[in-house]
């Protein structure tokens, strides 16, 4: 009897150990595959050439982050799906598991989508046109012709905090039009996330007057998912692990802020 009991206990322990060794199923849209939303241009975040709905020869901070996340989740197949920024905050079900598109976490946006744990701390940067004397304070920005991309926290900051004398120019499609306006001299200064403008200035150093500085706004980027996505707990755990082991810090140093623009007050 004792022998049978010992054998039964050993068998039960073996089953338990085997079960615990098996990876938990990650609730992605397609089993065994991770679909990541992206948009371009996003220098240093997403480098590569968009072809239809995907991207060729991808590299950059968010691309590398997506690969690291997939590895943490135990998923080897990753598909990249172009998802324009303008459509990220639609309440409709999304075709991707999550999107990495330099999206600032806000309470308003969180009403229609779910955000992951933050993966990057971002302030607003000031990219100025060539030939313009660099503004050294936020007050100096009030006199300039400012511009921003629509639906961004940069535009909200202009409207509610800076309140310039001239109505800001707003570009809806993507950051490309806003960058073009600064390059053409139509806009004195573009207010957009500092790593984005820093990357653009580095990419085309002769086209702009550089990044005059950054405005501290205590913003954070998070991955965008369907509201109430079941993937969120697993994604949060993966991102927090990548922060804890230094992976994200190394990626920031490799792809983003270097040097750090001065703080405008």
List each language-model region with its residue ranges.
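Ligand-binding clefts/hinges and TM-proximal coupling segments of bilobed small-molecule sensing domains
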Residues: 22-23, 153-170, 209-210, 240-265
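Extracytoplasmic small-molecule ligand-binding "clamshell" domains
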Residues: 23-101
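Bilobed "Venus flytrap"/periplasmic-binding protein-like clamshell domains
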Residues: 35, 43, 56-72, 103-104, ...
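Periplasmic-binding protein-like
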Residues: 40, 120-128, 194, 198, ...
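Extended ligand-binding regions for polar small-molecule ligands
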Residues: 63-72, 132, 152, 222-259
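Acidic, polar ligand-binding/catalytic clefts
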Residues: 78-140
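Short helix-initiation/N-cap motifs at beta->coil->alpha
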Residues: 78-90, 133-134, 169-184, 219
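A ligand-binding cleft/hinge motif common to bilobed small-molecule-binding domains
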Residues: 87-90, 103-111, 159-160, 183-184, ...
């Amino acid at each position: 009897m004792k022998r049978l009991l010992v054998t039964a206990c050993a068998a039960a322990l073996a089953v338990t150990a085997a079960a615990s060794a098996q990876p938990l199923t990650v609730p992605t849209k397609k089993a065994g595959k991770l679909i990541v939303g992206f948009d371009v241009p996003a220098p240093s975040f997403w480098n590569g050439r968009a072809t239809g709905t995907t991207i060729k020869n991808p590299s950059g901070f968010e691309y590398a982050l997506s690969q690291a996340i997939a590895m943490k989740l135990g998923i080897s197949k990753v598909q990249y799906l172009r998802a324009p920024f303008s459509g990220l905050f639609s309440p409709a079900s999304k075709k991707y598991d999550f999107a990495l598109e330099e999206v600032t976490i806000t309470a308003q946006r969180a009403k229609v989508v779910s955000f992951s744990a933050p993966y990057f701390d971002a302030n607003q940067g000031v990219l100025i046109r060539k030939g313009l004397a660099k503004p050294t304070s936020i007050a100096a920005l009030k006199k300039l012709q400012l511009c921003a991309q629509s639906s961004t926290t940069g535009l909200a900051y202009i409207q509610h905090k800076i309140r310039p004398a001239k109505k800001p120019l707003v570009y809806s499609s993507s950051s490309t039009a806003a960058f073009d306006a600064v390059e053409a001299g139509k806009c004195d200064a573009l207010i957009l996330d500092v790593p984005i403008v820093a990357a653009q200035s580095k990419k085309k150093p002769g086209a702009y007057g550089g990044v005059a500085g950054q405005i501290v706004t205590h913003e954070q980027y998070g991955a965008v998912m369907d509201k109430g996505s079941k993937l969120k707990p697993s994604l949060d755990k993966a991102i927090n692990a990548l922060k804890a082991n230094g992976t994200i810090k190394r990626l920031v140093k490799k792809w983003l802020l270097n040097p750090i623009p001065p703080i405008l007050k």
